[in-house]
């Protein structure tokens, strides 16, 4: 095997591999002999077809199938012999059988960027200090009280706090919008789920009343169908129900769960759950801040194909989130081209961060052990009610173990960095603040 390596760019190498005729021709002959025993051509008995006819009819097929095998069998040996460290699958750009009987293929591969690792220990990170206010607990209990309330139909105009059943149809420039229509829609007046302007129009309306209402929605409205648009609504009230709220006493707490004997126990449980959720959210924030701090000062080039792959994964995630709301990219006013443009810098930083973490893992000899894998399998099993064996079988059947191991390795490296970091307490924040930061970073 003859191997030549050429530098195409700082991070791309062209690997030219030539296999001698002595290695190639016996395999070609073996392929033809196998076909000779199997194929059936009119005018010849099976196994008696002349070799020249076999070659004439099947040359392209044999060479195509064999070239794929020859590349697969020799590519990894070639890059290993040359000491290359590919970080992407090869792009096979040239495959040819030479006149002397040899075989040549050219592979373009992306290699790991070379950079100096700076300081990664003792990073100063602000640790979110979480706290649960009594007002938050009272608000949650009030929401429980509201949900548990009995609903009674009333013959009067609707007021805040009522539940109104309404049919509505939205129009834009006189055309009915199929996605802005609902029958028997339950509107909780004052909750704000339908928007203040929409709910304000229903206040004062009674069963059987109809009304027209125009609303201009802001550009930052969460519903991508109506954001930034002026919509004309036709409303029809079907009925009005008022809530009969239960007293907030020990009996209410008992109705909330068998484990509660008093209102104090219910409040203690809510506080513990909220603190746990805040702490979990804070962990994500700390990891994000660690990565941000770690990346400061690094601008080394990363392989464009890895950035493109990361961008594709981000777009898939966006598509999945939209699908959960019954939307497509087009319906949301987005396109893959636009998202690629918006995501490229974030994707490059993620790829850069991954290279940084892997270099730290090499220096610190951090590896994924069997017990790390088992913990990872158990964590997923707990989420989806599966056994460790079932989770393991799932990953093996999909050939997804390597991405999973990479995720576990990154978690382990981040845990190491956190153990070496200097944590500075931040002011106490509410759950929404911590969760918002974790989602945005």
Swiss-Prot record:
The keyword Ribonucleoprotein does not apply. It catalyses: [protein]-peptidylproline (omega=180) = [protein]-peptidylproline (omega=0). GO terms for biological process: 'de novo' cotranslational protein folding; cell division; chaperone-mediated protein folding; protein transport; protein unfolding. Signal peptide: none annotated. It comes from the Bacteria. It is found in: Cytoplasm. Pfam families: FKBP_C, Trigger_C, Trigger_N. Its main location: cytoplasm. One of its GO terms (molecular function) is protein folding chaperone. Keywords: Cell cycle, Cell division, Chaperone, Cytoplasm, Isomerase, Rotamase. It is an enzyme of class 5 (isomerase). Gene3D superfamilies: 3.10.50.40, Trigger factor ribosome-binding domain (3.30.70.1050), Trigger factor, C-terminal domain (1.10.3120.10). InterPro entries: PPIase_dom_sf, PPIase_FKBP_dom, Trig_fac, Trigger_fac_C, Trigger_fac_C_sf, Trigger_fac_ribosome-bd_bac, Trigger_fac_ribosome-bd_sf, Trigger_fact/SurA_dom_sf. Residues 161-246 form the PPIase FKBP-type domain. GO terms for cellular component: cytoplasm. Its EC number is 5.2.1.8. Involved in protein export. Acts as a chaperone by maintaining the newly synthesized protein in an open conformation. Functions as a peptidyl-prolyl cis-trans isomerase. Belongs to the FKBP-type PPIase family. Tig subfamily. Consists of 3 domains; the N-terminus binds the ribosome, the middle domain has PPIase activity, while the C-terminus has intrinsic chaperone activity on its own. PANTHER family: TRIGGER FACTOR CHAPERONE AND PEPTIDYL-PROLYL CIS/TRANS ISOMERASE (PTHR30560), TRIGGER FACTOR-LIKE PROTEIN TIG, CHLOROPLASTIC (PTHR30560:SF3). HAMAP family: Trigger_factor_Tig. This is Trigger factor. It comes from Desulfotalea psychrophila (strain LSv54 / DSM 12343). The gene is tig.
């Amino acid at each position: 095997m003859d191997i030549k390596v050429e530098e195409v760019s700082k991070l791309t190498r062209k690997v030219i591999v030539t296999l001698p005729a002595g290695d190639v021709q016996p395999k070609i002959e073996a392929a033809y002999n196998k076909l000779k025993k199997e194929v059936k051509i009119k005018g010849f008995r099976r196994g008696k077809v002349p070799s020249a006819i076999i070659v004439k009819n099947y040359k392209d097929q044999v060479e195509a199938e064999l070239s794929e095998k020859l590349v697969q069998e020799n590519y990894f040996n070639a890059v290993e012999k040359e000491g290359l460290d590919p970080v992407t699958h090869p792009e096979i750009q040239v495959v040819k059988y030479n006149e002397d009987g040899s075989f040549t293929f050219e592979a373009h591969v992306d290699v790991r960027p070379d950079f100096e690792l700076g300081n990664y220990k003792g990073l100063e990170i602000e640790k979110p200090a979480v706290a649960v206010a009594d007002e938050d607990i009272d608000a949650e209990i009030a929401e429980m009280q509201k949900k548990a309330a009995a609903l009674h139909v009333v013959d009067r105009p609707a007021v805040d706090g009522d539940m109104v059943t309404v049919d509505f149809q939205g129009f834009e420039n006189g055309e009915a919008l199929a996605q802005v229509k609902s029958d028997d829609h339950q509107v909780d007046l004052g909750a704000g789920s339908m928007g203040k302007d929409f709910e304000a129009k229903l206040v004062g309306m009674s069963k059987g009343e109809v009304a027209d209402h125009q609303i201009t929605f802001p550009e930052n409205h969460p519903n991508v169908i109506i954001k930034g648009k002026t919509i004309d609504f036709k409303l029809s009230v079907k009925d009005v129900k008022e809530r009969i709220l239960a007293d907030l006493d020990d009996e209410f707490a008992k109705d909330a769960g068998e484990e509660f004997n008093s209102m104090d126990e219910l409040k203690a449980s809510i506080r513990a759950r909220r603190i746990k959720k805040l702490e979990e959210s804070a962990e994500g924030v700390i990891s994000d801040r660690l990565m941000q701090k770690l990346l400061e000062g690094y601008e080394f080039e990363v392989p464009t194909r890895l950035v493109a792959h990361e961008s594709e994964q981000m777009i898939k995630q966006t598509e999945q989130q939209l699908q959960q709301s019954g939307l497509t990219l087009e319906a949301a006013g987005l396109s893959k081209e636009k998202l690629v443009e918006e995501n490229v810098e974030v994707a490059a930083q993620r790829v850069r961060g991954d290279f940084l973490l892997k270099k730290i893992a090499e220096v610190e000899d951090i590896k994924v052990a069997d017990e790390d894998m088992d913990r990872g399998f158990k964590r997923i099993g707990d989420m989806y009610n599966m056994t460790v064996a079932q989770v393991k079988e799932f990953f093996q059947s999909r050939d997804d173990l390597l991405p999973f191991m990479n995720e576990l390795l990154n978690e382990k490296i981040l845990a190491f960095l956190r153990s070496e970091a200097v944590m500075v307490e931040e002011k106490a924040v509410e759950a929404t603040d911590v969760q918002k930061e974790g989602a945005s970073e």
